[in-house]
Amino acid sequence: MEPQIERGTSRNASLFFSLPILAWAMYDLANTIFSMNIVSRYFPLFVTETLGQEDIMFSFAVSISMIFIALLSPLFGVLIDVRQKKRPYLITFALTSIVATGAIGVVGQMLGTHPSILYVGLGLFILANFAYNASLIFYNAQITDLGSRSEMGRISGFGVALGYVGTIIGLLAITPFVTGGVPDWVSKVLYLAPVAPGTEGGVNLNAFVPTALMFLVFSLPLFFMVKDRRDAAADGQAFQGSIVKEGYSRVWRTFKSAKEYKGLFRFLIAYFFFTDAINTVIAFMSVYAQGVMGLSASQLTLFLLVATAFAVVGSFIMGFVTDKIGSKKSIYVVLWLWVVALIIASVANTMPLFWVTGILIGIGMGSTWVSTRTLIVELSPVEKRGEFFGLFSLSGKVSAIIGPMVWGVITYLLRDYGDLGSRIAILSLLLFVLIGMWLMRKVPDGSKEIV
């Protein structure tokens, strides 16, 4: 049974100013600050630039955190469907990610140049990234509590757009902390390292505690204002044994019943491939921009801001486009953008050409999550929605194990050939997008009933 929340076309403008929807979307803003500041920018640079390690070390950390998510996603889906409680788990994982992120900065300062800093930092990052991704499973499933099926595209688009506004806020707000542009008392309170005058790009380690605080502050509206709704269609679901046993039993039963949900399973397989490329681009964007294109720290910040600005516009518009033409057609449009972006990025040897790549990547990132999140809602029956959101996450997270490892192995094997390894690595991602597009051919239109 869909939630009965002010159905009708009159909600077009007022939809986004509903307090629960606005509070829910604020978490998109909060977690995207973490994703950009930590996953895409400062942690990979901390590993490769500050500690002087190869890309493959960061690749391992990302992949390990995704292995844990892949293993536990089925259990989270059961918790959503059977207990119908998303909020407590979302808050728990969000706070875990926040604490682990801040700990990287604090412990890093305490250890200084001690050799153990690499392994402690990698361990804390694995925990932070795991918890962040776990929170998204419960967060994505909350969208069904906020509006009718016909409003999913707009609600999803609003969340993604606000999320990328968070990226802009995060990038701008973090700069003075990293470059030493804050008062001494602030540096002492936040346990920041001193920044020597003329230090190019500042101190990467100083990004972690302020990012953790921003993540926390912008998460508070969701923590206090978004409540769980019980769904009558899912009430009364009983299961034998423990949550663990039931979680994996359900996954097995779901795969056995693949014939019943052919369209949805085709989509999950397609999603596995094309999101592999997207997750890898997000993870290595900063490393590629600085290592291959030679962007300075300030140029990288501007590049990311421009990409994010286009992500905001793209995601907001894609919400309306998805509601208008359907999520499947929208996904095709977005994937063609990724094809063009990856080709240009792999051959770009001038700044103007690379800036075009940044714009396309920005539009592609924002639009991808809008259309895919909407399609999974359209294709999944309400009583199994949590289960399928778990599989949706599982598909994306397993792919996030493979992509970074492919990148890391290629760049490691070709490390003696300059930037050729990175260019081949980013071009290799094109194959994953094309496979995903080919598999999408037989995914049904989400507006039709899937049986």
Residue ranges and their predicted role:
Residues G8-A70, G263-F303:
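Helix-loop boundary and gating motifs at the non-cytosolic
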Residues A100, V107, T113-S135, L353-S367:
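Hydrophobic core of transmembrane alpha-helices in multi-pass small-molecule transporters
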